[in-house]
């Protein structure tokens, strides 16, 4: 499978945003589509709004307010406790940009994070075959010029 090929074939949803606030709003809407367990790739160039989207998802899950959600580039994993439909849910936001090998990836303990009540969002996960194979979908964010973004979400059936 090509790094650029879609990970999942199934339900596809597209959104266009014009600002960071719009991207957060889309994240809030997406939270309703994400049923645990999920492992989703977050794909997009630097600065396209991957973490901004996660802010909305975390807020909708009552896991964190947007200002509390930051990029996990240096810490690798941020964990948030939330709820979905009255049930506890764990939201993991992972950034593997700085990892260079599958061996380094193994030290994150991804298997332990993938539980029946977890939603795992992985930035730059398309770098690793093991993550691409296990992904249940992907979110692709592309710049449309200025602050405009196209967000394409594909979830496996």
Annotate each PLM feature.
Residues 2-29:
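N-terminal pre-Walker A segment at the start of P-loop NTPase domains
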Residues 2-6, 13, 100-157:
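Short phosphate-coordinating micro-motif centered on Lys-Gly-acidic
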Residues 31-37:
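Phosphate-binding P-loop
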Residues 40-42:
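Hydrophobic anchor at the beta1->P-loop junction of P-loop NTPases
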Residues 45:
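P-loop (Walker A) phosphate-binding loop of NTP-binding proteins
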Residues 50:
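Conserved lysine of the Walker
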Residues 59-68, 82:
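Post-Walker A helix-loop "phosphate-sensing" segment adjacent to the P-loop in P-loop NTPases
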Residues 69-92:
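AAA+/P-loop NTPase substrate/partner-engagement loops
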